[in-house]
Amino acid sequence: MNNISKQFGQRARTIRLKQGLSQGDVAKRMNVHRSYISSIERGIRNPSLKVIQRIAKALEVPMEKLIKD
């Protein structure tokens, strides 16, 4: 598990929860399985730039909000 991936996943999860969205909601917006979102949020998967863009779009936030400290 990569520390950067874990931090990214925690940011994505925090934003998702603040918006009142479930992992299933985000997964549906991205057309992926809920377990894929879960693995990203837990830092198990190292998302590509394209996936980060898709997550940002699904969460309706600028990509920078997901990757900046």
Locate the predicted segments by residue.
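Helix-turn-helix DNA-binding elements, focusing on the entry/boundary residues of the two helices
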Residues: 12, 23, 34, 49-52
